[in-house]
Amino acid sequence: MGKSQKKTAKGRLDKWYKLAKEQGYRSRAAFKLVQLNQKYSFLEKAKVIIDLCAAPGGWLQVASKTCKPGSLIVGVDLAPIKPIPNCHTFVEDITSDKCRSQLRGYLKTWKADVVLHDGAPNVGSAWLQDAYGQAQLVLMSMKLACEFLVAGGTFVTKVFRSRDYNNLLWVFKQLFNKVEATKPPSSRNVSAEIFVVCRGYKAPKKLDPRFTDPRTVFEEVQEPVTNVDAKVFHPEKRKRSREGYADDDYTLHKTVLASEFVTANDPIQILGTSAEIVFPKDDEECQRLYNLDVTTEEILLCCSDLQVLGKKEFRDILRWRLKIRDEMGIGKKVEDEQKTVVEEIPEMDEEERLDQELQDLSEAERVKLKRERRKANQRKQREIVRMQMGMLAPMDIGLEHEAMGEDSLFGLATAEKHGLKELENGTLPVTESVDEEVSTDNEVEYDSDDERDRLEADLDSMYSDYTKRKAESDVKYRVKKARGDLDDEEWNGIDNGTESDDSQIAETNFATPDKDRLTTSLLDKGSTKDGLSRKARMFFDQDIFDGIEDADADVEIMSMNRAAIKKREAELASQNNDDGSKGDQSEDSNDHIEVVPVASAHDEDDDWNSDSDNDENNVEIVTAEAMTLAQDIASRRKSKADLIDEGYNRWSFQSKEGLPDWFLDEETTVNKPNKPITKEAVLALREKMKALNARPIKKVLEAQGRKKMRTIKRLQRVAKKAEGISESGDMTESEKAKEISRLVSRATKSKPKAKPTLVVAKGPNKGLKSRPKGVKGKYKMVDSRMKKDLRAQKRLAKKGRR
């Protein structure tokens, strides 16, 4: 009787099968996970693991042995799984919602670090269907993993190599940072399985449902339609098909009748797909084409093999076809005679004709008024923009001469003629428009001052928002803007307040009200009474500046009074030297002069002098120009008069009132005096910066201060002890002196630094990476090589001294 032999299909009973039996694993697939973990190391750091399609539980056994104690491991499958230590299992379909709810019950608020999937459908004889089913199962497992994976998590799955493999890889790469495909050694070579390890889950806030839709992921891409024109007009670029025969077409040599080619509407399609144009003898139409004069031997030779023809031959065949169609009258359109229909218009009576003319005139007038209104609105819009941009007088292109016409702002005669209401209503343009072409689409009306003010405020707010955003992002611009705000105040001359009251009265008597004047100052209109801009006025309106404003006003009044007193004293001194007649005149002229009582200015002078001294002491030289000027003054190359003369230049009295901020920001970079600098000033400033940079840092200064304080406290304690010793009566004077000197020497003597212990690297200490046994404190590993090097260095140093 023969011995029964156990079947080993596909070599299933290999060494991995035997090793699984020896080590207690439930399946040989456990070694696949072991080898994957050895390569990528994703199980050691995982605290929560989900195993999909986990039966019979080989991967759960590996996870239980490899993960940290206390890790949460959950397995799910359609088949029941026998209990495994430290693992939770349940029976459910991974594509169902019930499976998701049970997983949430196990995980609570946790997220999984690793999701494993080693599932496959029941494989039969239909390989294509089984491969698609496995790819669909992988897609469902990935959908479940994306729901429970933590950011940066790992997903390991098994995939069959098929036509859908590349589509799955593309989806994985969209959701994970690193995607690698590998085949562990324990996987059979005859198997089509391959394992994909996806690491670094991106955790998008919202997952596109098309990534988990099998119909979208595995949709077949339609192949591009063959370009037949390229085969005819570019035969040298023709590519041979390497994908076999077309569907339902198993012939390579295609023929077409000459009559069909001539009468066809798409001859290029026929030339690109056919191999020969034939003239059969049993076809009368083809024989008639064959006997024509245009059908030459060359044409017949070209029609015999279309696959080897070039561009010139194809064009000859197409010309031959056109000639035949012209001779046979094929394709000519029958032109019907156009019949002109004459429509009789009934005659109109007198009333209807008048009504029609009135309607036409009113329509023409309406169109004319609409065109004029559109031009006026467009002109107003352009003028408002020019006023905002400061372009009232374009001097660079000579338009100021055109603007001096009868409709200009400075045409006073025209303004008087038409009245002030024309100016108030805005019908009189500020400057003559250069371009009268207007857009028919945009009609903007600004009939009130409120609209113009609103537009101006919007433009100012837009530019201020831009500067704020730039200041937030650029620190240098913020510092530059802060410095520029300090320099915005311009000097308007000395105002001592000593003008005659008579002149003021005369000015008030002869001055006309602003509402009756034709020419007004546009700059004074936009400025405030104190000369501050709108943004500065809003800043200084805060409550914190209430007291400061009054103090500044008091100081200004005091300075004006002091200047008036000095001038009054000078006038009185000059009057005493004049004769009597002049004295009488002076008495008459002084009748209306208000005499200001003299206050004690001693305290005020002291205050001003103290402030000036503080200002002079706080001046710092931080630029090369300032250093050059300081050196010139110190070396007496420049005097005070020279500096005053240099102060009179074209930048001294520039008016910034009424100019937009964007223009001022651009002008400050170029419109400034270029002061010379010297090499010595640059070097001196550089040395100053080096000295500043050479200062110790804050931590070093603090450490030095702490050390100094400790020394002071220690000396204070020694002084107290010495005082106690000196006051004691039990010791002699010599003993007191010795004890005090001993205390002082002990307090001032610094502790010597402990030298590191030398440990020779030999014996048990050879190649030691940690602290040697029995060694405390600092230590240093030495060997014979270092000893020889030290001796050599000493020898060379001694030789160099000689």
Swiss-Prot record:
Location of this chain's protein in the cell: Nucleus, Nucleolus
InterPro entries attached to this UniProt entry: RNA_methyltr_RlmE, RNA_MeTrfase_FtsJ_dom, rRNA-MeTfrase_E, rRNA_MeTfrase_SPB1-like_C, rRNA_MeTfrase_Spb1_DUF3381, SAM-dependent_MTases_sf, SPB1-like
Top-level taxon of origin: Eukaryota
Residues bound to S-adenosyl-L-methionine: G57, W59, D77, D93, D118
One of the record's GO molecular function terms: rRNA (guanine) methyltransferase activity
Active site per UniProt: K158
GO-annotated biological processes: assembly of large subunit precursor of preribosome; maturation of 5.8S rRNA from tricistronic rRNA transcript (SSU-rRNA, 5.8S rRNA, LSU-rRNA); maturation of LSU-rRNA from tricistronic rRNA transcript (SSU-rRNA, 5.8S rRNA, LSU-rRNA); rRNA methylation
Residues modified as Phosphoserine: S362
Coiled coil region boundaries: 347-389
Gene Ontology CC entries for this record: nucleolus; nucleus; preribosome; preribosome, large subunit precursor
Bias (Basic residues) ranges: 768-779, 793-802
Amino acid composition bias (Basic and acidic residues), ranges on this chain: 579-591, 780-792
Keywords for this protein: Coiled coil, Methyltransferase, Nucleus, Phosphoprotein, Ribosome biogenesis, rRNA processing, S-adenosyl-L-methionine, Transferase
Catalytic activity: a ribonucleotide in rRNA + S-adenosyl-L-methionine = a 2'-O-methylribonucleotide in rRNA + S-adenosyl-L-homocysteine + H(+)
Biased composition (Acidic residues): 433-450, 487-504
EC number: 2.1.1.-
Main location: nucleus
One Pfam entry name: FtsJ
Spans annotated as Disordered: 423-451, 487-513, 569-591, 718-802
Biological function: Required for proper assembly of pre-ribosomal particles during the biogenesis of the 60S ribosomal subunit.
Subunit and interaction comment: Component of the nucleolar and nucleoplasmic pre-60S ribosomal particle.
Family: Belongs to the class I-like SAM-binding methyltransferase superfamily. RNA methyltransferase RlmE family. SPB1 subfamily.
Official protein name in the record: AdoMet-dependent rRNA methyltransferase spb1
Taxonomic lineage from the root: Eukaryota, Fungi, Dikarya, Ascomycota, Taphrinomycotina
The encoding gene: spb1
